[in-house]
Amino acid sequence: MALTKEQKQEIIKQNSHFAKDTGSSEVQIAILSAEIKQLSEHLKQHPHDFHSKRGLFMKNSKRRNLVKYLANQN
């Protein structure tokens, strides 16, 4: 269900500012977006998986806060 190490490295490579940039807001938002997409696909198959649904809501909230932070910084 979680992103594999290779998937995460590819997302980091595409969105990073420098070689080992894993903590910038853009990278965090990109990783959360991929996880949200994956969880959404899982919930289409398993609509009564409430534990995953809560995780989806939490990831959405975290991404929303990061996007808001990024908008205020730029």
Swiss-Prot record:
Q: Which CDD domains match?
A: Ribosomal_S15p_S13e (cd00353)
Record keywords = Ribonucleoprotein, Ribosomal protein, RNA-binding, rRNA-binding
Report whether Zinc shows up as a keyword of the record.
no
Entry GO MF terms: rRNA binding; structural constituent of ribosome
A biological-process GO annotation: translation
Q: Which PANTHER family match?
A: RIBOSOMAL PROTEIN S15, BACTERIAL AND ORGANELLAR (PTHR23321), SMALL RIBOSOMAL SUBUNIT PROTEIN US15M (PTHR23321:SF26)
What does the record note on quaternary structure? Part of the 30S ribosomal subunit. Forms a bridge to the 50S subunit in the 70S ribosome, contacting the 23S rRNA.
Q: Which family does it belong to?
A: Belongs to the universal ribosomal protein uS15 family.
> What does this protein's UniProt record list under function?
One of the primary rRNA binding proteins, it binds directly to 16S rRNA where it helps nucleate assembly of the platform of the 30S subunit by binding and bridging several RNA helices of the 16S rRNA. Forms an intersubunit bridge (bridge B4) with the 23S rRNA of the 50S subunit in the ribosome.
Name of the protein described by the UniProt record: Small ribosomal subunit protein uS15
Name the species this protein comes from. Aster yellows witches'-broom phytoplasma (strain AYWB)
Query: Gene symbol?
Result: rpsO
